[in-house]
């Protein structure tokens, strides 16, 4: 096991494009760290820099107390699991897992012991003589993880390993990866664009956007106290509702919040009112119901603000302007076109500065 520390790490490509813009964070010994963000945020580039597959323009990467900037990937004592499995199609499962150890000159009895132990842990012992084409997607991913395990690395690196699997298998493999990492107690850095995957796997969440880190913390910390409007809207499904306060009637309802420019409310923190009165210190919002999604035990109600107030989104085009989402119990079913009032208490309100870059507590 080993800790991983990044100090002011930067990556600039020829032509001047800066993909990574001075990133600092540390992953503790045995910790499961997830890098999450939208496509193009730099998370995979950063992982490849840790692996040694991308050069570093500036800064330092430290693995286990050793700066590895100029050290070859094979000598960094890491193992990487890729999105496309990267298995040799002409080799058996056994030989795929043993190949790297043979190249390192390890003795046959030691190779055999490591391969069979990894196969036992991953429950793929009956598959050792099969070729990759004879395996399902989930089985191939287990083989790819087995190839990483036999190296007994200090750090596991995962580059969106579940993105090629169907939804049901993704959930099953997500659980398997977390159980495996805890069992081996090995430091892991995992890249994904799926915020649900990130929330369920991580000890530490690193939310990235545009080559910078927006927030670092445990999944619950990031969900409950997002540092910026980007984090508020990216972490959570459905995303947080964000509303401009400048010149808005909502500002008059707020107790405190001086300097706030944006109000955020999670969909589950809004409740339908029957008498139209907001809780003390909270807010009440009038909506016209535009759509209702029924998903069994709960429903998602989509509405537009009746008073014309503006909703904002750090991801233009992803949500209609002015849309508010409310999560309600499944048995509640407002009629389309109906006008309703929803409310949230003061302790469930999130306030941000006008630019959305700073949380105001």
From Swiss-Prot:
PROSITE patterns: ABC_TRANSPORTER_1, ABC_TRANSPORTER_2, UGPC
Example GO BP: glycerophosphodiester transmembrane transport
UniProt domain ABC transporter: residue ranges: 4-235
Sequence positions that bind ATP: 37-44
EC number(s) on file: 7.6.2.10
Matches recorded under CDD domains: ABC_MalK_N (cd03301)
Superkingdom per UniProt: Bacteria
MF GO annotations: ABC-type glycerol-3-phosphate transporter activity; ATP binding; ATP hydrolysis activity
Keywords, ordered alphabetically: ATP-binding, Cell inner membrane, Cell membrane, Membrane, Nucleotide-binding, Sugar transport, Translocase, Transport
Subcellular location: Cell inner membrane
Gene Ontology CC: ATP-binding cassette (ABC) transporter complex, substrate-binding subunit-containing
Broad class of the protein's primary localization: membrane
KW Iron (keyword) present: no
Transport among keywords: yes
Annotated membrane topology: Peripheral membrane protein
InterPro entries: AAA+_ATPase, ABC_transporter-like_ATP-bd, ABC_transporter-like_CS, ABC_transpr_MalK-like, ABC_transpr_MalK/UgpC-like, Mo/tungstate-bd_C_term_dom, P-loop_NTPase
Reactions catalysed, as given in the entry: sn-glycerol 3-phosphate(out) + ATP + H2O = sn-glycerol 3-phosphate(in) + ADP + phosphate + H(+)
Similarity comment: family membership: Belongs to the ABC transporter superfamily. sn-glycerol-3-phosphate importer (TC 3.A.1.1.3) family.
Binding partners and assembly: The complex is composed of two ATP-binding proteins (UgpC), two transmembrane proteins (UgpA and UgpE) and a solute-binding protein (UgpB).
Entry function: Part of the ABC transporter complex UgpBAEC involved in sn-glycerol-3-phosphate (G3P) import. Responsible for energy coupling to the transport system.
Protein name: sn-glycerol-3-phosphate import ATP-binding protein UgpC
Species per Swiss-Prot/TrEMBL record: Rhodopseudomonas palustris (strain BisA53)
